């Protein structure tokens, strides 16, 4: 055995000993309380037909053929970015291959040596990875803690200051106090970056637009693989920001651009979203019903979103509860440490427009049995 292979095995054995080894699981026929397909777009026949109709109008090659800076650019890609900028009320838009690529490209390039990034302690791993690749000094502030952020911003700095948050947090499901944060950023001349991944579609065009603070946010990131049922992401900001990222965001420069099917899927999903108010209201109704049914149980985190999490400390304990739920043909997955801090392991329930109240009742009956 090669030394490198043994090192891999030893590392995996250590993780197994910590009861935190991840595995790929397939539950094909279970009722979905797991996916990020909040509006059901990933299974929508209407969206499928829209995409097929648009594909039939184009004779371009299937793949993009290269980076956007080489052979991978197209009129469809440019038109999509113009459409997305208008849709999200932004000056400019730049499409990335995924939300991960968008955050890594953005955070690794936007801040230089001497700059500072203050970030909510619960921001996504992709933001952490981007910050690690930057030359900026990066400091967390306590989750949604305005006072702690104020203390951070009071620190003297020589360079540019950025503040990074999510509008809806992926593990806890709660909202960032965006208006308070944006007011602080304006006061301290800090640039606010908001990841809208789990708000897009669930709350219309995102919480930034819902709260009418687009002009106060320096950068927004929207992803298309969740409520929009597609793939890819967009970074929204000024024309200067877009030009900068085209020149310096390595995850944009050094990768093959999205294929035609993905570009068309993104636009069609947005057009479907504009006429899917009833579907969005059905999701919001399910969220309201779920919160009513768990009211008073302090093990559930307080969340106004489609993400509802119940703390079950211990990797083995949360696995056992999820196994019981899965045996009833309900797809709920455990969230283990180190993905979340030790002692904060949980079941993470994702609600959808297509879930029925009977399915929700069945899930909660098993959880409490």
Segment roles from a protein language model:
Residues 106-125:
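Conserved PLP-anchoring active-site segment centered on the Schiff-base-forming lysine
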Residues 212-244:
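Active-site PLP attachment segment
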Residues 41, 282-288, 295-329, 351-353:
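Conserved PLP-binding catalytic core of the aspartate aminotransferase-like
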Residues 2-62, 190:
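N-terminal "arm"/small-domain region of PLP-dependent enzymes with the aminotransferase-like
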Residues 139-194:
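Active-site phosphate-binding strand-loop segment of PLP-dependent enzymes
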Residues 56-98, 287:
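Conserved N-terminal alpha-helix of the aminotransferase class I/II PLP-enzyme fold
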Residues 41-49, 53, 82, 86, ...:
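PLP-dependent enzyme catalytic core of the Aspartate aminotransferase-like
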Residues 257-276, 282, 286:
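Structural motif of enzymes handling amino- and sulfur-group chemistry
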